[in-house]
């Protein structure tokens, strides 16, 4: 029984991982070497060194080694058995059947080696897959390196079983799936996994009856094929007659691996001229007809290609599913190492963590590099060397591989020949070579055997052709060939020019720096790597070769500034002089027909989409050599600060690994010009914060401003932050808001702030949850250190509408209103929050703003309604009711309701005297007018001390559910879900528009959310933190559906990020989705629109006029009643402003024409010092109107924001009139 169970486990694991022969092209060589090892102790020693080198620690979670070996043996026997299956020649074969074509095909072309060839990467469980958006067809299939406008959305992560899932917009299953990605990232591996999983009955069996796998590099060897012959090639053994297979074309899947490799043009033939399936035609025409749907239009296709090759490959690909392979996750990198080195049957070693070489681990995101690294380590072990790898680039790793595998310098001549073969193949887009090709090139028989043995070359199973172990390896050898050619004196400058021309002709000007050959070439021109090449080839390279080639490539006029591909090339080169010269000579504002200048808040702010850890590493590495002063890594729900130009914003849709954080922060140790870093919205682990603070302590780090808003920091992280502040860091501004630091964490920060070496001048953190003792400690620190300004999101200066003595509406700070009300714990809310009853409005008071707790005193029996919250109370007598705003997330996530019910309205915590309330109407946002929702599905959830209770309301009205004789606890409306309906529930929604003026630019935030007062309040508070003001515009008239997507557009040319909004419910405590709209000049106004993405019908529009916009000014503090007159903010702080305004001329420029005449402007400017200029300005201000002083205040706020914020915090409010 044990043996049976073992076999069963083996079969299961093999289905997931594949065989060792699939893993490695040098499998047989490895087995021979294993037999040559002297003892198991050698292996044990090696594994111990490996564990030490890579920083792994042991766990008990991985599969035992013995089991893995059994799986490998089983899979090897299974493939051996399959390969021996032959057709019975005595079987009767009719014309056009699969067996006949199968046998005929064997005589003309080698069998497709999709399942038997010794590939590199079949021993991993899964790859990171990003399903991308493809709006409007396939006009732009290639992801641009620079995005003047960031894509509407970055897509979402999927699994292999989701490749053919229905399109979210059309609900149609795709017929074409494009697997794209960088070189060596695992595209072919994924395609083979699909075929293998289907063969073994694990994937897509319900959708496809036949799956055919084709290697396009092998198909390209054929001149002509019929459709029947093509189908025969796609099967390991014949399964059914051709006619029977073609009778259900909708059940067929054709997998075309490496569609971009051959040098062909796939042309669709005229549908009227389509030939019979048994008639041969040129291969490229046959494939072009498949792609163009001229033949088998109902069939499905899966293509794999490098991303850069897609656009010119096929003119039109309809509406494909585009899936980008992003390589290994950090866990899968570790898993790959485990499987690669799991060889000794009696040794069980579980590797859990890779941490000591973050750059190498980031490089290993690419599966091919993983294999390369493992091979190098294994070669070192075989040669008895101490395990050590210091390679920082893929190029250096390839050279290390060569130095470890090439047996001595006597092969240097043959190695040159192999390089020439590789270069010729790259130019001709050939990856398969016949024996005669190798001999014609000058490769000797013994050299070919050696290259096969060491794994540089591999023989195809048919023995008819050879190839490099991987296309990337061929490209590396081609790059070496160009170095060898250009080093010959006979070529001189002409050789350099010819090399560049050859590369441009092969890859195109736009994609030159995306080509691995070019990246390897730049890497080989590194001083250290050229010395390594000299050792390998036993020759000397003139240094002029290096300089001239670099100049030829980087100095070309088509070299695009700040191109992601160029960043990769510069990273491979690693030469500081080249990096500095290149990065500093390119402006950040791109120009030209393909590069529109991108303006965020200003010019010189560029956006770049990065998808992988590798891309993040190379970009941040190059940035440290540039003139970029501000860097933002865009996080989810992140509010943006104004960045100092030149700046760069990086967008990423996938999680960042721990190794990648370490590399990023390591690059900050010497930042040159980088002074601002915004990581807000990105979750930072304990170890990531430690790496960050270590970098900030380095003398070469010049960062002055660090934003860590909403990064998931805890008190545990504060010890590192405090240590960094105490270590002579240059950091002057630190924002830690929306992090749960707690009293203990803030106390640790205070220790760092007290250190005389601390240079911090601005600290922003939340104080609402802090104890009075800690807040007092912070204030004492400010008093002791006048240069330190501690800002808070504590709303002590929140303002509310009141009536001034003239009967006009003014604004009063909540702090002063508390004093005027006679209750220091209460604040009156505005009239929108009043309860309207029999005697008119009843004001609502704030009990605790931070806890969202309010109170209303209803004076008599009757019905009361609050328009703002939607709450109704029917009371029998005077009663005081307390109302708290809650978040569903804190109650629902531990109950089964989250799977069976959807939130249908806000959640309130209501407290009232028992028996005083006879009915309560709880608001909901489900639209009943559509007639699609049964009112019996509504429930009111009570969250009580003893558990949760669902209660059926007495009745359900269009906007609320009525609960009679209620008992109170946290309560709200839920809707029971019906599986057939899913989430397609019509709801009432609202649009919220906020704006902020900065200089001449206007930034709008547009939200589309359910009509939930708690969400609206949370958004209001969040926007207020960043001084955005809400504009009231009508909501959508019709009901909308949760999960639907809407396109945001404008009547003018504006920048909208993202261009789509999804209507979804998010808890008030979560970040809400919004579109950010940048407007340089609003002119007479702009028209904003929301259009249903699926049906393209207009669902909402609003006209924003200049009159809708008012400066985003803080609120005004009321003067005491006995005050003779209300002083404006600028008059209240005249002394401070005269003493502390350090730059008057920009202030005067803003007032010129609005407040100051030409004569006044020149008179003030003529004063000798800033203080004299300010005194002269204030003397003239005595005759200014209140509006003129408002302009003065706004100009001060724009030119001296920190000063104004400091004065606001200390005064508790601002006296301005809107």
UniProtKB/Swiss-Prot annotation:
Binding site for ATP: 181-188
Residue segments, region Disordered: 1-44, 71-91, 799-842
Pfam families in UniProt: CARD (PF00619), FIIND (PF13553), LRR_6 (PF13516), NACHT (PF05729), NLRC4_HD2 (PF17776), NOD2_WH (PF17779), UPA-FIIND (PF23679)
Domain CARD: 1122-1211
LRR repeat copies, ranges: 343-364, 673-693, 730-750
Site (Trigger for autolytic processing): 942
Family of this protein: Belongs to the NLRP family.
Function: Acts as the sensor component of the Nlrp1a inflammasome, which mediates inflammasome activation in response to various pathogen-associated signals, leading to subsequent pyroptosis. Inflammasomes are supramolecular complexes that assemble in the cytosol in response to pathogens and other damage-associated signals and play critical roles in innate immunity and inflammation. Acts as a recognition receptor (PRR): recognizes specific pathogens and other damage-associated signals, such as Val-boroPro inhibitor, and mediates the formation of the inflammasome polymeric complex.
Record's protein name: NACHT, LRR and PYD domains-containing protein 1a allele 3
Species in which this protein is naturally found: Rattus norvegicus
Protein's gene: Nlrp1a
